[in-house]
Amino acid sequence: MFSKSVTLAQYDPDLAAAIAQEDRRQQDHVELIASENYVSCAVMEAQGSQLTNKYAEGYPAKRYYGGCEYVDIVEQLAIDRVKELFGAAYANVQPHSGSQANQAVYASVLKPGDTILGMSLAHGGHLTHGASVNISGKLYNAVTYGLDENEVLDYAEVERLALEHKPKMIVAGASAYALQIDWAKFREIADKVGAYLFVDMAHYAGLVAGGEYPNPVPFCDFVTTTTHKTLRGPRGGVILCRDNTHEKALNSSIFPSLQGGPLMHVIAAKAVAFKEALQPEFKQYAKQVKINAAVMAEELVKRGLRIVSGRTESHVFLVDLQPMKITGKAAEAALGKAHITVNKNAIPNDPEKPFVTSGIRIGSAAMTTRGFNETDARVLSNLVADVLANPEDEANLAKVRGQVTALCDKYPVYGT
């Protein structure tokens, strides 16, 4: 038996204090990590609901447990909404993460040892696209492509490697690539070698939903995404397809192969986020995300910093810190002291170790959710440049921190 009236602060003050401190940090710091965002109060309410109590192995109307009549409604709402959002014929909303969604896609049509062709982690790809340290690189024969000398995705190399290695699956998508990806070109290459085309649009999904980035669904055999990042939902994953060809294989890859019971409270939160993304206001949000990122990149160039690929056409870009004689690790720490949160990130052909790096990754999704516009983005990018110009000057960091505080107070995350 548990108390029905005791609060978290009363029962576990240590944990409550840590949560309160994190809430304060989110309010007082500007979030520029490209994979992070703020969910709405409605999303949090759904995720904190009584649905966390319910086991529901299986799929709507095909459960292995009783009492699922209402969670069936919840999951079907999520399925229908995400299909409408991306123009998909099939959707699985049960993956606990984007990584598990990707694993399920591989497992649905590949066998261990099959060849996959994905973007190199060192050039902006993702761990789950065949990196040697990831299960995708251990189970499958992973071949990687990258960027050309202009730091643009090298489609000629993709085609050459595809013709040479005859992969069973080509993987497109990235975690640190600023430019738009040509899905039609990938489809053309995949068709030349009879490969499945799989796109992981986790970073770009919110922009796709808002009409600010090309939709990969019409071109692909499989599409996955996380539900957080630019899509602004809870942490989780989704699988989408343009038709129902692989429905049975994908469903069984998630359950019972990779997962047991779905997280119904998270699926409810996904449903809320999908409804939010279907609203006209979300299109304006996605547009502003791109504007803010472009403004920041342009301002940083004016301050003498180099942007990988020269510009951004999305929410994200990499800053090459080598001309500044500072590592990504040091830059992340200095910016953190000024209450600007970024992540260190490898740049193409980075001479530094992955935990040090020569770059930082900047994203505009979270700041835009707070209400930052292009004027604020211009101010913020100059504050970033001020820190990078004098990363060890405590007086400089304190000055920037004060200016960041003023910006944050202007745009509270959840307060009024």
From Swiss-Prot:
Q: Where does (6S)-5,6,7,8-tetrahydrofolate bind?
A: 121, 125-127
Q: What protein name applies here?
A: Serine hydroxymethyltransferase
Q: Which HAMAP family match?
A: SHMT (MF_00051)
Please name the GO terms of the biological process aspect recorded for this protein, alphabetically. Answer: glycine biosynthetic process from serine; tetrahydrofolate interconversion
Instruction: Name its co-factor(s).
Output: pyridoxal 5'-phosphate
Supply the InterPro entries for this chain. Answer: PyrdxlP-dep_Trfase (IPR015424), PyrdxlP-dep_Trfase_major (IPR015421), PyrdxlP-dep_Trfase_small (IPR015422), Ser_HO-MeTrfase (IPR001085), Ser_HO-MeTrfase-like (IPR049943), Ser_HO-MeTrfase_PLP_BS (IPR019798), SHMT-like_dom (IPR039429)
Spell out the Pfam families in the cross-references.
SHMT
Q: Which GO terms describe its molecular function?
A: glycine hydroxymethyltransferase activity; pyridoxal phosphate binding
Q: Which family does it belong to?
A: Belongs to the SHMT family.
Where located?
Answer: Cytoplasm
Q: What is its EC number?
A: 2.1.2.1
Modified residue annotations for N6-(pyridoxal phosphate)lysine:
229
Residues under site feature: Plays an important role in substrate specificity: 228
Q: Enumerate the catalysed reactions.
A: (6R)-5,10-methylene-5,6,7,8-tetrahydrofolate + glycine + H2O = (6S)-5,6,7,8-tetrahydrofolate + L-serine
Alphabetically ordered keywords of this record? Amino-acid biosynthesis, Cytoplasm, One-carbon metabolism, Pyridoxal phosphate, Transferase
The record's note on quaternary structure and interaction partners says: Homodimer.
Functionally, this protein is described as follows:
Catalyzes the reversible interconversion of serine and glycine with tetrahydrofolate (THF) serving as the one-carbon carrier. This reaction serves as the major source of one-carbon groups required for the biosynthesis of purines, thymidylate, methionine, and other important biomolecules. Also exhibits THF-independent aldolase activity toward beta-hydroxyamino acids, producing glycine and aldehydes, via a retro-aldol mechanism.
Q: Which pathway does the protein contribute to?
A: One-carbon metabolism; tetrahydrofolate interconversion; Amino-acid biosynthesis; glycine biosynthesis; glycine from L-serine: step 1/1
Q: Which organism is it from?
A: Neisseria gonorrhoeae (strain ATCC 700825 / FA 1090)
The entry's cellular-component GO terms read: cytosol
